[in-house]
Amino acid sequence: MNRIVGILISILMLACIGVTMAAETPVEATIEPKNTFSEPLATQMVLLKGIFDPKVEPMDPANDAIEITGVLKLNHNEVRGVVNINNKKGEFAGKCTPFKSSNFEGVVLKCGSEGSIKVLQINIGDGKLELFGKYGDGIVFLEGKIPEMSYKSLASSASAPTSVRPEAWMVDILL
């Protein structure tokens, strides 16, 4: 009986020592990089033409018109784009709930020496894409319709993240 009690006490002491050592030993956490765009569900080629409201002086269509061309890659809840504003390349990235209204506040479309558009919100859903942003002292509003057939195929592919849909389509966004 004494032998069993001795063994139990020894095990308990070893456990206490192990817990003490574990508490003193720093644990190194490794964060693996996420390759979120390795399997895009779809690639959307977009042409955006929008309104620039300068707020300060009347708009000069020759100089103030903003045109953005780029690619949006939708993968799960992320959107990434490459933009070209007045022949200046830029890019942006952010998160959204696919095909539902989503807040992109703080995301910036950087456009070289032409300045940048600070995105206030991007809405993707119900077959539409809308972008609200600030450009200098003015407001930018872009809006367009996503073709119904392509939108449905995108929505169906969103439920299967492992499937890759190489389907690409063009959306003209005109105001």
Curated annotation (Swiss-Prot):
Swiss-Prot/TrEMBL keywords: Signal
Secretion signal span: 1-22
Top-level taxonomy: Archaea, Methanobacteriati, Methanobacteriota, Archaeoglobi, Archaeoglobales
PROSITE patterns in UniProt: PROKAR_LIPOPROTEIN
Keyword Signal: yes
Source domain of life: Archaea
Protein name: Uncharacterized protein AF_0397
